[in-house]
């Protein structure tokens, strides 16, 4: 990535690989499985063992490494040398032979094409909003999806992120040197801050990141339509009668597409209900069979 934004983001992740971890924590594949976050385990259960998977913007590789434990073809791509170096250290230590790592700038369509294959599942979790052009990056990575392949796109929501933006402002001004407030803010998102590496990584990513954009459900539904991706559902749910703020049932199951009033109603609710996640939400869909990848 040669843009000013791209250089800043790349430099940020080269200094602060994300998610950060100490390699000594992982001495076996069992350690890796035990350390997987709950939603990673949900994804693992939702993706068939014989499916090919690519994690776009894999960072230090915890998600893609975990998914490779019971699959023969899992890729992780990123453009941060430091993050990939840590991921490669994990790959070598645990002998994760089915896990392929490659440096790729997702704004560069030629680098995307050079991957040379398509995948059954394309995951891009919390990445597009840190590029200089989220839609162009999305459009590029959709070339990696097989016809009838599945996608999961995680982004910051324009409504859900509002309270975190307020905290970011306070942390950079009034409470700039207040470690108690810093700890409080981190606890709001990840709970335990005894894991200093995780806490430092989250603080840097949420409060010190050089670039982020926010997006809406309707905007992403438009992206899906333009790229012949059938919209399935979101987590948190955009179903009008969803009871849970973070509905994890039926990953890649189809739901009724929300109308504009429902989209607005649900996203206004996310201001409070996704406060802990920083307004993060995931969009699920499936590529239509008739869509050509050329």
Say what each PLM segment does.
Residues 150-187:
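Conserved class I S-adenosyl-L-methionine
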Residues 95-109:
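Conserved SAM-binding strand-loop segment of SAM-dependent methyltransferases
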Residues 111-121:
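A short acidic, Gly/Pro-enriched loop at the edge of an enzyme's catalytic core
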Residues 197-294:
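Rossmann-like AdoMet/SAM-dependent catalytic core
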Residues 135-147:
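A short glycine-rich, Lys/Arg-flanked "PGG" loop and its adjoining helix->strand segment in the class I
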Residues 80:
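Conserved SAM/SAH-binding beta-strand->alpha-helix loop
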């Amino acid at each position: 990535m040669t843009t000013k934004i791209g250089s800043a983001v790349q430099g940020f992740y080269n200094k602060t690989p994300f998610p950060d971890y100490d390699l000594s924590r992982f001495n076996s594949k069992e350690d890796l499985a035990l350390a997987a976050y709950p939603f990673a385990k949900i994804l693992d259960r939702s993706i068939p063992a014989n499916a090919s998977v690519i994690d776009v913007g894999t960072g230090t590789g915890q998600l893609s490494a975990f998914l490779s434990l019971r699959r023969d073809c899992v890729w992780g791509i990123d453009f941060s040398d430091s993050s990939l170096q840590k991921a490669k250290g994990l790959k070598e230590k645990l002998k994760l032979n089915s896990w392929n790592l490659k440096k790729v700038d997702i704004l560069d369509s030629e680098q995307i094409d050079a991957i040379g294959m398509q995948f059954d599942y394309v995951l891009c979790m919390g990445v597009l909003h840190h590029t200089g052009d989220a839609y162009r990056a999305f459009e590029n990575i959709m070339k990696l999806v097989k016809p009838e392949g599945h996608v999961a796109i995680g982004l910051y929501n324009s409504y859900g992120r509002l309270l975190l933006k307020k905290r970011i402002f306070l942390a950079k001004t009034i409470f700039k040197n207040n470690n108690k407030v810093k700890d409080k803010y981190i606890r709001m998102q990840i709970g335990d801050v005894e894991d200093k590496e995780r806490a430092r990584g989250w603080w840097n990513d949420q409060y010190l990141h050089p670039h982020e954009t926010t997006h809406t459900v309707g905007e992403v539904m438009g992206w899906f339509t333009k790229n012949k991706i059938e919209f399935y559902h979101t987590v948190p749910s955009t179903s009008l009668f969803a009871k849970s703020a973070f509905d994890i049932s039926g990953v890649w199951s189809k739901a009724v597409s929300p109308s504009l009033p429902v989209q607005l109603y649900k996203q206004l609710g996310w201001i409070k209900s996704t406060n802990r996640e920083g307004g993060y939400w995931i969009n699920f869909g499936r590529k239509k069979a008739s869509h050509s990848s050329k």
